[in-house]
Amino acid sequence: MSSGGLLLLLGFLTLWAELTPISGQNRPMFCHLPADSGRCKAHIPRFYYNPASNQCQGFTYGGCGGNANNFETRDQCRHTCGASGNVGPRPRIASN
């Protein structure tokens, strides 16, 4: 096979890996953690993966603490945790 053919194959496999959804078995464990606003009092919009609905949902992050199930964008959440494209409701997180 020529080097051009190998590069084309490599490009195709890379694209396929990026577009293939993550199965529940391959999902990082932190994707199963609950939304955690943390201990600080800022009001930063973030997203977390909700395994019950298989969706990335919005929550308000306090700015410190919390856990790894915390993403700046819905796309980051979907890419990392393999959520469906449906948009779920924005849950309310009680402030301390």
Curated annotation (Swiss-Prot):
Q: Mind telling me which SUPFAM superfamilies this protein's record contains?
A: BPTI-like
Query: Which coarse location class applies to the principal site listed for this UniProt protein?
Result: secreted
Please give the superkingdom of this protein's source: Eukaryota
Signal peptide location in the record? 1-24
Tissue and organ distribution: Expressed by the venom gland.
Propeptide at which positions? 85-96
State the function annotated in the UniProt record. Answer: Serine protease inhibitor.
Would you tell me the protein name for this molecule?
A: Kunitz-type serine protease inhibitor C6
Q: Which organism is it from?
A: Daboia siamensis
